[in-house]
Amino acid sequence: SSIVLPQNWLFLTSYKKFREKLLKNDTWHLIVRLGPGAFETISGEVVKAILISMSRGNSAKESSGLFGEADDGNLIRGVDVSEPRTAAEKAAQLLTAEIKSVLQAKQLENPDARVAFDKVSGELLSKYADGVNGMHGADSFHFRFNYWEITDFLIWHFFQCTHEETTHFGGKQNVFYWAEDGRCHRDNPRAYVKGEGVWGKPGVVVSMMKILPVTLYSGNKFDISCTPVISRNPAHLPAIWCFCSSSEYNEAVRRIDQKLNVTNATLVKVPFDLDHWTKVAKEKYPNGLPKPYTDDPTQWIFHGHPCGSVIWDEEKKGTAHGPLRTDDTVLQVAVARLLGYRWPSELDAGMELADEQREWVNRCEALLPYADEDGIVCIPPVRGEVSASDRLLNLLAAAYGDAWSSDILAALLKSADHAGKTLETWLREKFFTQHCK
């Protein structure tokens, strides 16, 4: 018999026993991965369908021809047309796509008996690392905020979250309420407090959606939508990072799990060649993995300097000072400083940061006198105070130092979509809209 149905049961851990039963007791003939958009009358992009053909009983002699056996073991034939976007394109590719063959009995040897067209061989990442489940407080709107909305970091703890692209450091914009050691969450049956065993340990954070972007993990509490992969041997972490940050990692995971959001257990059930990736790590990171750095002001590790820059230097194989920034965040950071805001990295001398990142944090001390004492800055001059635009101009000049010029100001206004105009009109017309992005 043949049937079209969602593909998830071929690889989800919860269907392991069901797969084992069918693989042992029935004969599988053909699996066609149709993917999203396989039917002209169904527009959904989330449901990924398969066409599967099988028969009762597990006799390797029952089929012949295309669905024949090899070495007395039944072969499952597989065709993958999941990549084309339209039903017409999929139909055309069905006629030309490669037909793969895998032994049915060998599927039982795959992790969790997952059904895959490609052979899963070699040692798994799970031999060297664990994929750890995250937590949520059952009420994100009540217990989870952006860090810049909070001032008391004794009861609000930094909370590692998902990120959109692979980068050394990302997903560091949230805090999570954790008064009395998280008592309100531990007492709440709807909340999930997970991952305590890896808090404080370094690792690799995988966002569990789409192309599985990764970032380095610094040991913070973490969201249920991302999974830290924690090396059992810290010496293996650079190799694991190099593997997980490569395209090969996403491809390996997707060979065994095509679900939109994968599970934490799946993330370490892929082949991992420790020797190979150790060599890659020695070449890419001879001085070790970087300490936290970023020029993104939405991250709690941001140095707080309006124009300071820290980059990864491929030649040096380490962090380094970059060129002074003139991007669209510079004016926003400068206004925040003018109003008296300071980043968490400035307030925590013990926060782990790259040396260059800490240098920029220290340089922010020279900008403190430019901050308003009461946090209220009027655009026009009021009661003897200088206008907001002039005060902002003075702060920027101090931040850039000898590099400051009218050309820098012009570049900043251009980056803020306000080319050829003034700081005052930017404050009046553009600042708030851009601040709320």
Tell where the protein language model's regions lie, with residue ranges:
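General secondary-structure edge motif
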Residues: 2, 32, 186, 209, ...
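Glycine-rich, acidic and aromatic/proline-enriched surface loops and short helix-turn segments
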Residues: 243-250
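Polyanion-binding catalytic cores of nucleic-acid enzymes and NTP/SAM-utilizing transferases
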Residues: 100-232, 268, 280-296, 300-327, ...
